[in-house]
Each structure stands twice: as structure tokens, then as C-alpha cells.
């Protein structure tokens, strides 16, 4: 076990944000979460601590590794001002130290009585006033917060497995921090970053790069009192859901801001690896991507919100692959024909009679044609039967019902003869599809609560010989719920989509739409593919996109 100390007369009056481990308890996985800065008062705060077997010490001459009797086992000469350290899940201890002369950040490992530099990165363009590390419990990839003056800050991925180019660590996000930061601390178990602002107090914000909130938790708290405040309040534990890694991502959508929304997967009938992903850009149109995430086609059909498709539909003795999208400007449903090689053409535009067209899904009806379920923000859900007269596609209204508040995501489970639809603030509903294709009464399957957090967004059914699972996006907690697609609709588990450091893919947050297929698309997608919209493109910072997740990974983390 290794703990950290520091000795210096250079910077008095502030107890660095990271003495949870040093001043309160011996260093352990349970006490991780504290940024460190050179101060004399920090060294004095070491007195109540139990003697560990090894300790890291930042002295004037450099970083030292001490044994239990305080004898120097190893020393790495340097002048340093900011540092922090963590014990990794494999038992190793690493420290991130900023060289006071060059500004370079050095990742140092304490190993077998030695100190060894593992990685180094150029410092940021601004002057660093506070530095602290973060090791997320659910996906322990080492990250660093570097905070400067005037409210400037950045969050970096400094894990050994992360790619780095031209001497720079991958930046996960820019931070709007406090204007006069005097130190920072991260309580890993809470996924919470604390920043001390001189003359104001202590601010707290999410350490998760995908979240944004910040609030003042201790007005007037002096920076020197931060360790005592943290000790008095105790340490909570965030909801640590299992994490799956994305294996791919699409290029960013063309529209800026909140533009990407809903995907749909088209499976190539002969070459599954040549399958396509349709994705709505709700500002400009519909994009088509291959499984490598490259855009193969773009249809400038305006503000289409959601999209769905079905393959092998029967009309006039022929088979058709068709996609439908909700068009908000014209309050219509746009119908697309899909060719055998995955090319889309606009085939028709159907009126709905709705005032604010929003979500859409579709399913094969008993005659082998397509039924479309399109909803309005006022709660109305309309069922339209797609018909073909000669070479013309038309829509025939079949039924309509209404939820109390705004719906959006929905999915038709043809095998189960049922429609699932999400009411954003209330929960997940199920309606039986009758033999004549009409809808039965609505049944609340899973209300909004601790498991399914609002807003309820995208949903899709993965059906294979192993069973049928409904996966639903719970936008408020950046999570996904998996439940059985048949009564009693038992919840199997929840998960989040984290980052993939090796491939340079950021994590997923605030998901709108999703789709899933059980088809074998080859490679890691042998058991199917889950595609989810990512509400915040962090790494690198850019426009929204869609992430690809092997379904086998989802099942791997289910209980």
C-alpha cells in the first residue's frame, strides 16, 4: 500500500484538495479521490495518519518513494508544484506530477522500490493553478483535471492505454471552472470534482466528462478547511452501473448543436458486413453510414426527427425494404425505398393530420405490409397503414390513441404482436396489436423511477434463439435498461456506454434514439449490433454522432 505526502515552504495557507487519503486514512481504494498541491500545512496534516508500508513524498529535490520508517527507497529529481496520485485496480500506484520548469506533466509509477516514468505530456496553454486525478469506479481509466486562472480548465485522459499524439494527452472536455481556483479534489466514489475558489467557497461539479452541472456546496469555506469539510461529510458512492465499450462510431452529423437523434439498422441480404446505419440529422436530413462509420449517402429532406425501417415487405407480389421518418416541418411521414445495395431514394411523403410530428416506429402488419406509428408532442399516437396503388405509396389511417404527456421513442415487436412506446416523463407503455392490426389498451410496463429515469427515449427489441430483450434509453442517467420483451417484462439489468481508450472513442451521454439487430454482421457483431445516439461528442470535441456497441458486450455485463 502506498500513500502520498508533501513537504514545502513555498505555498502556505492552503491545504491542498487532496488529503482524504493522506490526512484522514491510509491510502486505499476506498479513500481514493484527492488532488495535491505543495504546501507546508499539508505536511503537518499527516500526523494522525497510520504508518503505511510505502509512501510517496514530493520534496524540494523531487518525488521520493519512502518505506515505512521514512527512509528514501527511490528518488526522481525534479522541481514540481502540482501533483496527485492514485492506486490502480491492479495494485500499482501512479503519480501525475507537473514539472515546475517545463510545465510538462509526467506520469510516474512506483514499482518494486523504484520510480519509473511511464508517460509524459506537454502542459496546457494556460498556467495551471490546480491539478487532480480521477479514477472512475465503473470504468477505471485514469483522468486528470488541470485548472487554470480565469475559469479555464480541461479534463484529460492520462491512462497508459490512451493514445497520444504530438506530446499531447487526449482532451476529454474543456471546463468552465471557477475564476480563482486554489485547488481541486475528486472523490472517485461519487464521481464528483470539488474546486476551492478563494474568497467564495467550495464548488462541486460532476467529474464525468459527459455531465455538466456545477453548484456551490460550502459558501465561505476557506481552502485550508477543505480536508476537514470532506471528512465531516463522509463519502457517498455514485450509482456505478456496468460499462460496455463502443467498438465504432460514425462521423459527426452535418448539423450543429443538438442535431443527431435516431438510428435504424439495415441488414444487407447477402453481405452482412456491408449493412448500413441510417441516422437522422434533425436539422438537415437523413444520413446513411457503413459499419465503419463512414457516411455513404445523405438525403437533404429537412428536419426529420426519428427513423425506422422494415425489410422484405410484401406489396404487389414484390418484396420491398422501406424506411420511414417523421418530418417535423411539414408534419408528414417521409417514405424511403432501400435498394439491394443499401441506397435510399425518397418514395413518398404522407400527411398525418398531427400538429407537431415527433417520434415514429413501424412494423409488419398481418398482410405483410407496413404499419406506421407516428406520435405528436401532445400525446397523440396515430397508426397509418402504408398502401401501394400502382407506383404510388399512400397512407390510410387505421387507429389513434393518446397518452397524457409527450411520447417519442417506440418499437413494434412483430413476433410478440405488441407495440412499446415511451412517455418521456412517465414510463414505458405496451399495447397489444390485434389480429386486424389495430392496437389494444395501453399497459404501463415500467414507470419512471430509480431504474428507468426520465426522459424515456429510444427503444428497440433484440430477438434471437436465446430470448427477446427490450433495450430502452434512460436519458436522465445516461444509462440503458434491458428488460424481457414478454410478460412479466422483468428487468434484466442496466448499463452505460463508456469510452474506448484504445480506439479513441468517447463515452455516450444523453442518448435520444437507438436501434438493435440480432443479425450476425460479422466480427465483433456476431451476436448483433446496438447503435445509440451520443448527445455529447467529447473526444475530440465536435458535433454529435452515433456509437456502435457489440450486443455480446451488453449481454456480458448483464447479471
Spans of features found by a protein language model:
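Intrinsically disordered, low-complexity regions enriched in Ser/Pro/Gly/Gln/His and often acidic
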Residues: 5-7, 20, 55, 222
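Bacterial N-terminal signal peptides that target proteins for export
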Residues: 2-16
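Bacterial N-terminal signal peptides
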Residues: 16-26
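Sequence/structural signature of beta-propeller domains
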Residues: 29-559
Amino acid at each position: 500500500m502506498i500513500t502520498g505526502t508533501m513537504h514545502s515552504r513555498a505555498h502556505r495557507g492552503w491545504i491542498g484538495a487532496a488529503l482524504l487519503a493522506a490526512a484522514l486514512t491510509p491510502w486505499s481504494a476506498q479513500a481514493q479521490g484527492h488532488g495535491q498541491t505543495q504546501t507546508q500545512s499539508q505536511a503537518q496534516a499527516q500526523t494522525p495518519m497510520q504508518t503505511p508500508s510505502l509512501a510517496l513524498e514530493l520534496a524540494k529535490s523531487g518525488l521520493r518513494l519512502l518505506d515505512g520508517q521514512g527512509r528514501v527507497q527511490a528518488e526522481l529529481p525534479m522541481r514540481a508544484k502540482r501533483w496527485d496520485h492514485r492506486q490502480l485496480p491492479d495494485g500499482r500506484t501512479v503519480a501525475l506530477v507537473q514539472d515546475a520548469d517545463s510545465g510538462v506533466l509526467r506520469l510516474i509509477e512506483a514499482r518494486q522500490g523504484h520510480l519509473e516514468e511511464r508517460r509524459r505530456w506537454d502542459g496546457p496553454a494556460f498556467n495551471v493553478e490546480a491539478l487532480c486525478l480521477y479514477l472512475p469506479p465503473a470504468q477505471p481509466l485514469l483522468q486528470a483535471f488541470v485548472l487554470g486562472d480565469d475559469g479555464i480548465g480541461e479534463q484529460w485522459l492520462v491512462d497508459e492505454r490512451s493514445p497520444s499524439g504530438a506530446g499531447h494527452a487526449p482532451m476529454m472536455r474543456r471546463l468552465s471552472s471557477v475564476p480563482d481556483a486554489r485547488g481541486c479534489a475528486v472523490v472517485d466514489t461519487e464521481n464528483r470534482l470539488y474546486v476551492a475558489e478563494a474568497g467564495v467557497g467550495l464548488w462541486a461539479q460532476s467529474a464525468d466528462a459527459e455531465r455538466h452541472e456545477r453548484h456551490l456546496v460550502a459558501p465561505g469555506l476557506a481552502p485550508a478547511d477543505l480536508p476537514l469539510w470532506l471528512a465531516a461529510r463522509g463519502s457517498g458512492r455514485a450509482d456505478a452501473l456496468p460499462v460496455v465499450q463502443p467498438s465504432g462510431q460514425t462521423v459527426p452529423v452535418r448539423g450543429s448543436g443538438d442535431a443527431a437523434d435516431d438510428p435504424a439498422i439495415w441488414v444487407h441480404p447477402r453481405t452482412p458486413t456491408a449493412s448500413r446505419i441510417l441516422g437522422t440529422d434533425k436539422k438537415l436530413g437523413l444520413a446513411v453510414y457503413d459499419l465503419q462509420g463512414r457516411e455513404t449517402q445523405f438525403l437533404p429532406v429537412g428536419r426529420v426527427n426519428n427513423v425506422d425501417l422494415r425489410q422484405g415487405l410484401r406489396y404487389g407480389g414484390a418484396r420491398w425494404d422501406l424506411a420511414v421518418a417523421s418530418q417535423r416541418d411539414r408534419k408528414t411521414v417521409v417514405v424511403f425505398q432501400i435498394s439491394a445495395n443499401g441506397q435510399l431514394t425518397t418514395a413518398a411523403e404522407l400527411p398525418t393530420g398531427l400538429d407537431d410530428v415527433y417520434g415514429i416506429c413501424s412494423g409488419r402488419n398481418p398482410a405483410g405490409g407496413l404499419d406506421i406509428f407516428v406520435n405528436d408532442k401532445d400525446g397523440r399516437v396515430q397508426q397509418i397503414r402504408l398502401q401501394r396503388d400502382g407506383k404510388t405509396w399512400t397512407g390510410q389511417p387505421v387507429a389513434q390513441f393518446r397518452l397524457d404527456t409527450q411520447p417519442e421513442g417506440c418499437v413494434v415487436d412483430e413476433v410478440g404482436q405488441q407495440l412499446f412506446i415511451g412517455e418521456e416523463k412517465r414510463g414505458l407503455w405496451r399495447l397489444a396489436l390485434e389480429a386486424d392490426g389495430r392496437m389494444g389498451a395501453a399497459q404501463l410496463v415500467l414507470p419512471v423511477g430509480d431504474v428507468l429515469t426520465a426522459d424515456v427515449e429510444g427503444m428497440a427489441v433484440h430477438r434471437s434463439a436465446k430470448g427477446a430483450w427490450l433495450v430502452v434509453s434512460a436519458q436522465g442517467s445516461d444509462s440503458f435498461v434491458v428488460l424481457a420483451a414478454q410478460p412479466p417484462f422483468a428487468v434484466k439489468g442496466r448499463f452505460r456506454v463508456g469510452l474506448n481508450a484504445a480506439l479513441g472513442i468517447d463515452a455516450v451521454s444523453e442518448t435520444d434514439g437507438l436501434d438493435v439487430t440480432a443479425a450476425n454482421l460479422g466480427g465483433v457483431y456476431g451476436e448483433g449490433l446496438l447503435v445509440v445516439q451520443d448527445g455529447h461528442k467529447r473526444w475530440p470535441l465536435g458535433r454529435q454522432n452515433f456509437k456502435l456497441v457489440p450486443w455480446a458486450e451488453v449481454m456480458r455485463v448483464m447479471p
